[in-house]
Amino acid sequence: MSESKDKTTAPAADSNVNEIASGISGLLSSKDVAESNLRESSHEVQVTLADQQADPNSPLYSAKSFEALGLHENLLKGIYAMKYQKPSKIQEKALPLLLQNPPKNMIGQSQSGTGKTAAFILTMLSRIDYDLQKPQAIALAPSRELARQIMDVARTMSKFTNVTTCLCLPDEVKRGEKITAQLIIGTPGKTFDMIKSKGIDTAAIKVFVLDEADNMLDQQSLGEQSIRVKNTMPKSCQLVLFSATFPTNVYDFAVRIAPGANEIRLKQEELSVEGIKQFYMDCKDEDHKYEVLVELYNLLTIGQSIIFCAKRETADRIAQKMTQEGHKVDSLHGRLETADRDRTIDAFRDGKSKVLISTNVIARGIDIQQVTLVINYDMPLTQTGEADAETYLHRIGRTGRFGRKGVSINFVHDQQSWSYMDQIEKALKCQITRVATNDLEEMEYTIKEALKQIGK
């Protein structure tokens, strides 16, 4: 079982919080603060309170410092160990609402890199009774990779507490195994399987989180499994849904399953990729797409790059072919063995590999800060075969992370793929610039110049 236990307990606020916080804060240099890598929106966060009589602009619903939240010193230590000096805009508004008593449900729309993961992890850790060795907080993510990343945040933030944690993923826990960890991060299918087989007792759960909720609820199987998990929770359980995007159908569903929720939203235009220079390359056919990709290999390795494909077979075929030609690349998709998936994403995250060919399994939420270039080898489509602007947003959002600059390139090779890109360009109101593929030097120069701007 993937359970862990750390040092000291964190039950409630303490009198020497400010002294400890200021001491740790004083140790942070400007470089440390910069390294926390939070994206700050240029617009204010919009708050809609469940209590219509309450004023969302009241100081009661805003926290300019972590100390103002009344957190235990051990949680504050964890926050500062993560190099957060003050709450981001989304945290400033979300945390007072998430931590209020009695607990209230929340529907939150927030882009990756704004500190939303830290916000819901902090909520989970704050609700836990550290003397009760039972599951008390569960968060679900749509992919194994994202669940592991969330657990990394949880373990870092909780390292000064004695919380016990468990990753509820295939090959991490066995069916029927009894999980007593207080904080559980998992995927919907495995978590529901463990609940159904009596491996997880949900009677004491206080907080249930769906991350990337639009993905969960929009995909039929993940949505159904997530709802089954949610239906096992006590009625008093606080339900939190976070996502970068909330299409109307998903939002309506979220409101139904999280009644009386406070809401935090960014305007749709704020969920953009302003710092990412977007290009497209007009290829002759599928074979030409591969040839152009190979020509770009030297540019792919300047930083780190992700190549997104529509199918697992395509990802494997490209990776195999490029490897045979002497190029160092890795592929990642849901059909790989779990150990291979973990090893591949860890090597990429650690910077040991430079080029990753993937399906949408890492399109959402994955934080790999060194990614400077994303290629859409295939344009993203919905399950009904329509252009998928939201997945496109998530895909190219893997570069330009946390407000930094980045470059994305779309491959189009026929009228259909051109039409998909055109629909996405209009939906996102962005500009995608053509780069000629018949002049290698000009092609390399254009992309290199765009990549050079990243450091400026």
From Swiss-Prot:
Tell me what reaction this enzyme catalyses. ATP + H2O = ADP + phosphate + H(+)
Tell me the GO BP annotations in alphabetical order.
Answer: poly(A)+ mRNA export from nucleus; protein transport; translational termination; tRNA export from nucleus
List, alphabetically, the Pfam families matched.
Answer: DEAD, Helicase_C
Question: What EC numbers are recorded for this enzyme?
Answer: 3.6.4.13
User: Its Gene Ontology molecular function terms?
Assistant: ATP binding; ATP hydrolysis activity; inositol hexakisphosphate binding; mRNA binding; RNA helicase activity
Q: List the disulfide bonds.
A: none
One GO cellular component this record assigns the protein to is: cytoplasmic stress granule
Q: Which UniProt keywords apply?
A: ATP-binding, Cytoplasm, Helicase, Hydrolase, Membrane, mRNA transport, Nuclear pore complex, Nucleotide-binding, Nucleus, Protein transport, RNA-binding, Translocation, Transport
Residues annotated to bind ATP: 110-117
> Looking at its record, which EC class is this enzyme?
hydrolase
Q: Which residues form the Helicase ATP-binding domain?
A: 97-264
Annotated compartments: Cytoplasm; Nucleus, Nuclear pore complex; Nucleus membrane
Q: How does it sit in the membrane?
A: Peripheral membrane protein
Which PROSITE patterns does this one have?
DEAD_ATP_HELICASE, HELICASE_ATP_BIND_1, HELICASE_CTER, Q_MOTIF
SUPFAM superfamilies, per database record: P-loop containing nucleoside triphosphate hydrolases
Q: State the source organism's domain of life.
A: Eukaryota
Motif placement: DEAD box: 211-214
Every Helicase C-terminal domain range: 275-451
Q: What does this protein do?
A: ATP-dependent RNA helicase associated with the nuclear pore complex and essential for mRNA export from the nucleus. May participate in a terminal step of mRNA export through the removal of proteins that accompany mRNA through the nucleopore complex. May also be involved in early transcription.
Matches recorded under PANTHER family: ATP-DEPENDENT RNA HELICASE DBP3
Q: How does it assemble?
A: Associates with the nuclear pore complex.
Q: What is this protein called?
A: ATP-dependent RNA helicase DBP5
Species this protein is from: Mycosarcoma maydis (Corn smut fungus)
